[in-house]
Amino acid sequence: MAVPIALTIAGSDSGGGAGIQADLRTFAFHQVHGTCAITCVTAQNTLGVTRVDAIAPAGVAAQLDAVLSDLPPQALKTGMLLNAEIMEVVAGTIAPLFIPRIIDPVMVSRTGAVLIDQAAIAVLRDHLLPLATVLTPNRYEAQLLAGMDIQDAADLDRAARIIRDLGPQAVLIKGGAATGDWHGVDWWWDGQQSHILKTEAIATPHTHGSGCTLAAAIAANAALGLEILAAAQAAKHYVTKALRHSLAIGQGQGPLGHFYPLF
C-alpha cells in the first residue's frame, strides 16, 4: 500500500500543542506519514515559552539529508526556523524539490511580538518566500512583509498582492488575529483569483498551534493529491473542526483537538 509522505521542518513544543507535534498529528489524521527535521527545542506549556534552544545548522541539514535520501515527501511545510543560518540550510535543501512547499513564516506571534531578528527576516524574505507554493502569514506577519497596516478587506487584498510579488505562488493571510467581521476569515491570492476562506467562527481560548495546524493540513492534503487551493480549503475546514473540539488542558491556552473524532 502506497502511503503519502509529508515533511515538516519546524520546532519542537514540549507541551505538545504546536510545532512538529501539531504537524505530525495533523499528518496522521489525514492518513499521511509524517517525517520531520527539528530546528529548535522549546521548553513550553499552555502558559508560555520559557526557553528556546536552536539545533545546529549542520544538525538540521543531517536530518533533512536522512529523510530525503530514504523517505521523499510528496509535500512539505516549514514552521519556526529561528535564525538566518537554519533558514539558509532549509532554503538550499528544499529549492530543488518540485513538490508543494507550504511556508508558514513564523516571524510574529498572534499577539504581535516579533520572534526572529532582522537577519533572519531578510533571509526569509529573499530566499524562502520565492520557494513557497503557499505562504501562510498571520495578520501581523502580513503587515510586516507588506509594509502596511491591515484593517479591512481592501487592505487584505492589497497586502496579499504585495506579498505575492515577493515570490510565493499563492498567499493565504490568516485572520485568526483579526477582530470584528474578519476574525477567523482567511484571504487567498494566487495571482489570478482571490478567495475568502470562511467557516464558522469558533469561540474558544484554546487555539494554541492553529497556524501550524493549518499549514500542515494544507501540506497533508497536497500530499494526498489535492490541487493547492482545494488543499487550503479542506485544511480550513479541518482546523475549524479541530478548534470546535479544542482541548481545555493545562492552566492556559490549550491545543486543538487534532483527533477530534476520537476525543
Curated annotation (Swiss-Prot):
* Claim: Nucleotide-binding is one of the keywords in the record: yes
Q: What keywords are annotated for this sequence in UniProt?
A: ATP-binding, Kinase, Nucleotide-binding, Thiamine biosynthesis, Transferase
Pfam families reported in the protein's UniProt record: Phos_pyr_kin
Q: Which reaction does it catalyse?
A: 4-amino-5-hydroxymethyl-2-methylpyrimidine + ATP = 4-amino-2-methyl-5-(phosphooxymethyl)pyrimidine + ADP + H(+); 4-amino-2-methyl-5-(phosphooxymethyl)pyrimidine + ATP = 4-amino-2-methyl-5-(diphosphooxymethyl)pyrimidine + ADP
Recorded hits in InterPro entries, A to Z, give:
HMP/HMP-P_kinase_dom, PM/HMP-P_kinase-1, Ribokinase-like
KW Kinase (keyword) present: yes
Taxonomically, the superkingdom here is Bacteria
Under Gene3D superfamilies, the record lists:
3.40.1190.20
Enzyme Commission no = 2.7.1.49, 2.7.4.7
GO molecular function: any one?
ATP binding
Q: In which pathway does it act?
A: Cofactor biosynthesis; thiamine diphosphate biosynthesis; 4-amino-2-methyl-5-diphosphomethylpyrimidine from 5-amino-1-(5-phospho-D-ribosyl)imidazole: step 2/3; Cofactor biosynthesis; thiamine diphosphate biosynthesis; 4-amino-2-methyl-5-diphosphomethylpyrimidine from 5-amino-1-(5-phospho-D-ribosyl)imidazole: step 3/3
Per UniProt, where does 4-amino-5-hydroxymethyl-2-methylpyrimidine bind? Answer: 44
Any GO BP annotation: thiamine diphosphate biosynthetic process
* GO cellular component terms, semicolon-separated: cytosol
Task: Report the function annotation for this chain.
Answer: Catalyzes the phosphorylation of hydroxymethylpyrimidine phosphate (HMP-P) to HMP-PP, and of HMP to HMP-P.
Family recorded in the similarity comment: Belongs to the ThiD family.
Checking PANTHER family in the record gives: HYDROXYMETHYLPYRIMIDINE_PHOSPHOMETHYLPYRIMIDINE KINASE THI20-RELATED, PHOSPHOMETHYLPYRIMIDINE KINASE
Q: What is this protein called?
A: Hydroxymethylpyrimidine/phosphomethylpyrimidine kinase
Source organism of the structure: Synechococcus elongatus (strain ATCC 33912 / PCC 7942 / FACHB-805) (Anacystis nidulans R2)
Traced from the root, the source organism's taxonomic lineage reads:
Bacteria, Bacillati, Cyanobacteriota, Cyanophyceae, Synechococcales
Q: Which gene encodes it?
A: thiD
